[in-house]
Each structure stands twice: as structure tokens, then as C-alpha cells.
């Protein structure tokens, strides 16, 4: 891969000129590049905002979603070439662009033997079959390139048994069935999306002896209770009855055969028999029209009120069908899954604008390219924005109008839908370089869920730059509200420092930011426009991962006019320019203090008494948080003082490195040995109920179990020590460089 060579050109030139201050030192004479900015140029920023074109974004989306582009498919590779063509354009291209390929393990349904779900009568004959494909309501849901609904990485098999309803497939749901006296051994469990991850439904089911799992989307969760064809797409934005959510059921992210290693030819590969993280039993998703046939004919006890949905009947638990229903009482459900695993080539595409002053500092902006079917919303709405933003910046670059201070890297990731594979392989291959040099990662996957308001998820240091950007951009629609002012109407919180501000969500593992945050410790954000949650309870846009996620769906229902896409492009563009051109990095580390203080207060209020009973003190944690708060405030004051004068560029460089590297100090690769890739002690998955430091919360939750002994409480103490050490290390990182 050659992107490292490209980014090194500026360094090599500096060395040849005998500038020899430090690697990538930004005190390059202006004669070397008269366009090298010393700080954010507001005129350039205004130009970029004005040139981002909603119509061009719309046409990008039309082309990107014209055909299905499943990862590694011919159309996916066609889009690789489209990106390369755009980024090498002589008038609007970037400094360089290239594709890199990884050989990864993907999962597909058999074309010769499709997956089927049948009801088998008492005599062994098939008396009813679920739909194998989605209804072709617009002419785009059929054809050989539309992959059959399936659960990626679910094993093949043909289990058959009595049907039970297991709500969302959480561990407590299966325990509830056992409490009701239902024998789960050998049954088929019908579950609904939501509550826990896809793969967890199969894992939890298998623990209780279930032989196979079905998963459906309930209209109560996605359609605001609506389910008839005249109320759903193409007549509204709601999911049609035949719609089936596809998805990866792999528990981890990255290529399954090369954990912690890039999937290049020279890498060691795990034997397939030793791969972990796949669903243990056959699993298949179905549409809610088929789920209605099954669920509304179930026998047994009435399901709890919280388990009821919107299929127009009372949900029962089973097992088996009721005697007065549509199927004989002794009928069973057969789930025949014929998925296969294949090694396939999948490509990332990188486009690079080399920094004029600090070419060894990277601002990364990325999105995945692959989709389950047409993928107009997921992910092509993000790729359409990426292409327009890179066009505008590339045009300024080619005209000689602008070159950023720091390098900008645009990325189109491959095989995200199978488990964030492209981005993970990239972070594995360039782990050290990215950790040392990356300023921030900006992710724009689904750029527009709907057109009500901005929604940003991110680590605390990026809050300030997002706020600054959105205060200067007009919100779509009537009126003169800024995106910031509109955002605060929908998502807000009361900050002890700033008062009422928009609320940033935290980053989980739902898109390509995950390896950057959890594995590399890079300050990251995810930007999108979304819906008014007071008007819909949909857990996500209704046609998510179905064949109904098409260009017309976006054009007609989500964002007519594409003004919300344009707003996302402007927000992301402003953030990129602020991060790449500002003399002082606009990352505010003191904003972490609020998060740490809230975590500490939750630990004191909800865990303090319990910990005292086991002679575990929170005193060191209190001290560590206070140290961090003091050092973060002091660093902010030093920066403010320097901004008023004419600081030495090397001094600014050192301060910027402190800002950039803070996130890395929260990494501990041994903190969560059971959680692959999760090293960030503040943002790892939290299974405990207390909203505090995840390792501490999880350990306390396990230790509360009456069966837990001294080892469980020792783990609580270990997790507390891990957090304290991380916070003390973070505070030390923020001190003046000369101070240890």
C-alpha cells in the first residue's frame, strides 16, 4: 500500500532542504509553499460551505445506489473504480488515490439451495412456507444481484422443533421462558430485533438448548405499529410486510481469520475450526408478515405485556401451535440454512490531500462502501456526501487556491456490513503509524436517517469543534436557525460548565469508528441527520438493511431536495477544515472532565456502599479524577495564553500532540481480555446497570451474583486500579512536557 509513501513526501522534502528541526516540523519557510496556512482561513471555509451542492449529492446517490453492491461483488468493485476515477480527476481530484485489497472471510447464502423456513405437519409434509424473498413492489427488489435475506455467518443446518416466542432473545428472556415451565431443548425460538445484538440472540438461545433461531422486525419497533401494505413503502417510509433486515451475526469485528493482524497474504490465519464469534446454531431472519403467521398461531401462556407487539394478535409463548389455529397443533417449524463461508477480496480506497506544513498529522474522514442490497441510506448517503466534499476540496487544491496545514485522508471502507472489516484491517496494518499521527477520525456512514435535526456521537474532546462548526451553518428548512440552535431543540443536556447545550451520544461499535476509538484510542465522531423522536418510535429508519432501501425511498421520504445531506456535508466539511488548518488543534480535553465527574458520581452513589462492604475504597478514584480536572484546566489556560501571543511553532506542536494523544492514555489492552479489540477503559461495552466506568460497572454487576466469591471482588479491585492508573496517566500527559 502506497499511501504511507505519499504522506511522507512532505517529510522527505523537508529533510532535503535541510530544515531538520523535527519530523514533520511545521516551520517550513513560506517560500516552499506560499499556500501553507498558518491558521484556519475563514474565506476558504466560507467558499467550501458555498460550493457544497445538494444536487450533486443527489446525483452521487442515484449512481451509487443504482445497483446492489454487496461486499466483494462486481458492482462493489465497480464503485472502487468510480472512487479512484473521481479522486484522480485532473480538475477536482486529490494528490493521490489508491485501492488496497485484503483477502477476508465472508458469509453468503447458497444460490443453488436457498435458505427456507417451513411448517411441517404431523405426518412430515410441508404445510406452509415462509417467503424466501421480499416482495418486488418497485421493480428493484428482484433480480440475481439482490441477495436473499440471511444471517451472515450463521452456520448451516436444518433444525426442526416446536416454536417458542422469546421476545428479543436476551438472556433474561430465555430465563423467563424457563420460569414459565417451558422446556427449550430442541425448540425453534422466534425473536424480534432490538434489545441485544443480532448474534447474541443465537448465543443466548443455544445456552438453553434451543436448536434454531428466527428473527423478525416487529411493526411496533420500526413502523409505529403500522403494518398493512397501504400504510408502508412505497406509500410511506414504513417497512413493508415482506421486508427482512439482513445483517452480520458475527460477534466481533474485523476479518474472522486474522484477529489483530491485517488480512494480507503473509499473515497467519486461524484454522476455521478454531474461529470464535460465529452464531452457534442455525439462524434466519424473516419478514413480519411471516412472523405474524407463526406468532399469531402460537399456543401456550400469554406473553408478558412488555413482550407484546403490533402484529394484530395476542402474543403467546408456545411451545407449538394452538389447536384452533391455521396449523395442526403438533406441527413443527423447520429452519433450513445453507450459508457458506468464502474467502473473498475486499478493497479499501484512500484519497489523500498532503498537508503543507504538518504532513505527518492526519485528519481521517471515512465511510464504508458496501451494502446489503441497494443501500441508498446505508451507506450510500454517506458516500454521496464524501464524494461531494472531496470534489470541492479537490477543486480548490487543483486550482492552487488552498492546501491544508495537515494531511487529509478520505477513506472508503470495504466489507463493513460483515463486521467493520475494511476499517479494522486498515487499523491493524498501520497500527503504530495511525496511533502516532492521527489527529481525529470523522465517520459519516448513514448521513441522513431523516431530515429533522443533526445527531452527533463522539468522544468528549470533539464536542467543541462540532459546536463551533454548527453554530456557523444555517439549518435546512424555513427560518434562520443555525444547525446548532436547531439541534439543541431535539437533543440537549444541562452542562455545569456551558449551560444548555446539544448532547453528543457516545460511540459504541455500530460503524467504522469502532476500531479507531476502541483499538487505537483516536478521538472520533459520527455525524448524521436524523428524525424527530417525538414523532416516531422507530429504532432506526424502517427499511434498514432491506431491499427497500433505494434512491426513490430517500428522494421521496427521507430528504426531498437533499438539504439535510447538504447540511451534513457542510458540518463535516467545516469540522475537517478546522481540524486540518487550525494552528492550535480545536480539541478541548477539559470536556472530558464532565464525563469523568459524572462517572465518578454514579460510582459513588450506586456502588459506594457496596464497595465499602467489601473493603474497596473509591478514594484513589476521586483523587485521580480531581488530578485530571486540574491538569485539563491548566492546559486549557496555557493554550489560551499562547493564543494571545506569537508562540513558537514547536511549542504549539508539543501542545497539539498533548491534545491529540490524550485519548490514547485511556487504552489498556489487558483491561478486557474477553472483549476483542476493546481497550478503551472509558468506552468499552457496559453490561452493568450503573452508568459509570464500564470495567468497574461490569465487574460489580458480576460480583453481586450471590454465587460469586473472592475472585469476583478481586476483579472489581483490578478494574478500579485500571481506571485509576489510566486517569493518572492522562493527567500526566496533560502536564507541561518537561514535567514528569
From Swiss-Prot:
Its cofactor is Zn(2+). Ca(2+) binds at residues 258, 261, 425, 428. Detected in small intestine (at protein level). Detected in ileum. Detected in small intestine, spleen and testis. Isoform 2 and isoform 3 are found in the small intestine and colon. Keywords: Aminopeptidase, Calcium, Cell membrane, Disulfide bond, Glycoprotein, Hydrolase, Membrane, Metal-binding, Metalloprotease, Protease, Signal-anchor, Transmembrane, Transmembrane helix, Zinc. Homodimer. It holds the Pfam family PA. This is Aminopeptidase NAALADL1. InterPro entries: PA_dom_sf (IPR046450), PA_domain (IPR003137), Peptidase_M28 (IPR007484), Peptidase_M28B (IPR039373), TFR-like_dimer_dom (IPR007365), TFR-like_dimer_dom_sf (IPR036757). GO terms for molecular function: aminopeptidase activity; calcium ion binding; carboxypeptidase activity; metallopeptidase activity; peptidase activity; protein homodimerization activity; zinc ion binding. It is a single-pass type II membrane protein. SUPFAM superfamilies: PA domain, Transferrin receptor-like dimerisation domain, Zn-dependent exopeptidases. Residues 29-740 are extracellular. Disulfide bonds join 296-313. It comes from Homo sapiens. Zn(2+) 2 binds at residues 378, 417, 545.
Amino acid at each position: 500500500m502506497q499511501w504511507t509513501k505519499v504522506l511522507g513526501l512532505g517529510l522527505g522534502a523537508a529533510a532535503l532542504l535541510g530544515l531538520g528541526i523535527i519530523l514533520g516540523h511545521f516551520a517550513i519557510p513560506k517560500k516552499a509553499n506560499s499556500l501553507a496556512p498558518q491558521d484556519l482561513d475563514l474565506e476558504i471555509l466560507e467558499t467550501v460551505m458555498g460550493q457544497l451542492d445538494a444536487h450533486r449529492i443527489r446525483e452521487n446517490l442515484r449512481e451509487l445506489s443504482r445497483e446492489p453492491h454487496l461486499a466483494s461483488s462486481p458492482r462493489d468493485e465497480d464503485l472502487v473504480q468510480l472512487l479512484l476515477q473521481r479522486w484522480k480527476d485532473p480538475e477536482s481530484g486529490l494528490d493521490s488515490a489508491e485501492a488496497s485489497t485484503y483477502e477476508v472471510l465472508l458469509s453468503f447464502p447458497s444460490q443453488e439451495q436457498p435458505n427456507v423456513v417451513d411448517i411441517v405437519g404431523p405426518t412430515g409434509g410441508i404445510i406452509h412456507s415462509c417467503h424466501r424473498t421480499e416482495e418486488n413492489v418497485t421493480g428493484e427488489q428482484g433480480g440475481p444481484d439482490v441477495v436473499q435475506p440471511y444471517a451472515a455467518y450463521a452456520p448451516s443446518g436444518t433444525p426442526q422443533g416446536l416454536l417458542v416466542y422469546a421476545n428479543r432473545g436476551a438472556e433474561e428472556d430465555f430465563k423467563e421462558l424457563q420460569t414459565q415451565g417451558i422446556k427449550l431443548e430442541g425448540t425453534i425460538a422466534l425473536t424480534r430485533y432490538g434489545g441485544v445484538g443480532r448474534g447474541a440472540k443465537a448465543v443466548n438461545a443455544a445456552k438453553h438448548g434451543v436448536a434454531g433461531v428466527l428473527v423478525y422486525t416487529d411493526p411496533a419497533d420500526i413502523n409505529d405499529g403500522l403494518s398493512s401494505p397501504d400504510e408502508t413503502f412505497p406509500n410511506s417510509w414504513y417497512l413493508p410486510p415482506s421486508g427482512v433486515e439482513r445483517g452480520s451475526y458475527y460477534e466481533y469485528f474485523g476479518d474472522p481469520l486474522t484477529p489483530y493482524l491485517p488480512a494480507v497474504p503473509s499473515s497467519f490465519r486461524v484454522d476455521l475450526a478454531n474461529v470464535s464469534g460465529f452464531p452457534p446454531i442455525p439462524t434466519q431472519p424473516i419478514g413480519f408478515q411471516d412472523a405474524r403467521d407463526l406468532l399469531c398461531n402460537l399456543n401456550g401462556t400469554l406473553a408478558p405485556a412488555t413482550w407484546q407487539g403490533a402484529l394484530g394478535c395476542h402474543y403467546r409463548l408456545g411451545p407449538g401451535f394452538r389447536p384452533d389455529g391455521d396449523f395442526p397443533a403438533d406441527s413443527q417449524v423447520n429452519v433450513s440454512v445453507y450459508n457458506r463461508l468464502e474467502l473473498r477480496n475486499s478493497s479499501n480506497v484512500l484519497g489523500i490531500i498532503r498537508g503543507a506544513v504538518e504532513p505527518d498529522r492526519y485528519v481521517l474522514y471515512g465511510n464504508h462502501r458496501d451494502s446489503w442490497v441497494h443501500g441508498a441510506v446505508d451507506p450510500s448517503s454517506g458516500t454521496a456526501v464524501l464524494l461531494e466534499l472531496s470534489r470541492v476540496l479537490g477543486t480548490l487544491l487543483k486550482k492552487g487556491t488552498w492546501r491544508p496545514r495537515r494531511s487529509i485522508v478520505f477513506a472508503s471502507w470495504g466489507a463493513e456490513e460483515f463486521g467493520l472489516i475494511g476499517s479494522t484491517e486498515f487499523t491493524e496494518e498501520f497500527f503504530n503509524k495511525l496511533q502516532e499521527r492521527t489527529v481525529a477520525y470523522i465517520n459519516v456512514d448513514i448521513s441522513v436517517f431523516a431530515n429533522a435535526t443533526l445527531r452527533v456521537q463522539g468522544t468528549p474532546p470533539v464536542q467543541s469543534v462540532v459546536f463551533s462548526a454548527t453554530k456557523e451553518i444555517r439549518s435546512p428548512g424555513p427560518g434562520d436557525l443555525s444547525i446548532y440552535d436547531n439541534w439543541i431543540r431535539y437533543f440537549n443536556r444541562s452542562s455545569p460548565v456551558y449551560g444548555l447545550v446539544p448532547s453528543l451520544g457516545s460511540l459504541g461499535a455500530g460503524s467504522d469508528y469502532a476500531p479507531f476509538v476502541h483499538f487505537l484510542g483516536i478521538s472520533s465522531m459520527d455525524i448524521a441527520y436524523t428524525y424527530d423522536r417525538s414523532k416516531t418510535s422507530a429504532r432506526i429508519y424502517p427499511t434498514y438493511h432491506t431491499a427497500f432501501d433505494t434512491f426513490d425511498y430517500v428522494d421521496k421520504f427521507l430528504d426531498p431536495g437533499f438539504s439535510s445531506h447538504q447540511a451534513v456535508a457542510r458540518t463535516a466539511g467545516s469540522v475537517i477544515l478546522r481540524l486540518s488548518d487550525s494552528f492550535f488543534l480545536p480539541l478541548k480535553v477539559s470536556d472530558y472532565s464532565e464525563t469523568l465527574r459524572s462517572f465518578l458520581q454514579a460510582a459513588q452513589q450506586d456502588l459506594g456502599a457496596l464497595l465499602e462492604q467489601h473493603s474497596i475504597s473509591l478514594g484513589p478514584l476521586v483523587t485521580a479524577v480531581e488530578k485530571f480536572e486540574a491538569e485539563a484546566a491548566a492546559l486549557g489556560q496555557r493554550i489560551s495564553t499562547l493564543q494571545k501571543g506569537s508562540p513558537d511553532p514547536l511549542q504549539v506542536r508539543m501542545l497539539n500532540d498533548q491534545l491529540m494523544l490524550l485519548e490514547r492514555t485511556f487504552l489498556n489492552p489487558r483491561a478486557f481480555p474477553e472483549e476483542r479489540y476493546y481497550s478503551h477503559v472509558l468506552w468499552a461495552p457496559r453490561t452493568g446497570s450503573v452508568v459509570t466506568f464500564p470495567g468497574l460497572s461490569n465487574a460489580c454487576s458480576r460480583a453481586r451474583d450471590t454465587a460469586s466469591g473472592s475472585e469476583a471482588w478481586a476483579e472489581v479491585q483490578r478494574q478500579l486500579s485500571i481506571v485509576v492508573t489510566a486517569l493518572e496517566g492522562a493527567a500526566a500527559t496533560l502536564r507541561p512536557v518537561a514535567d514528569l
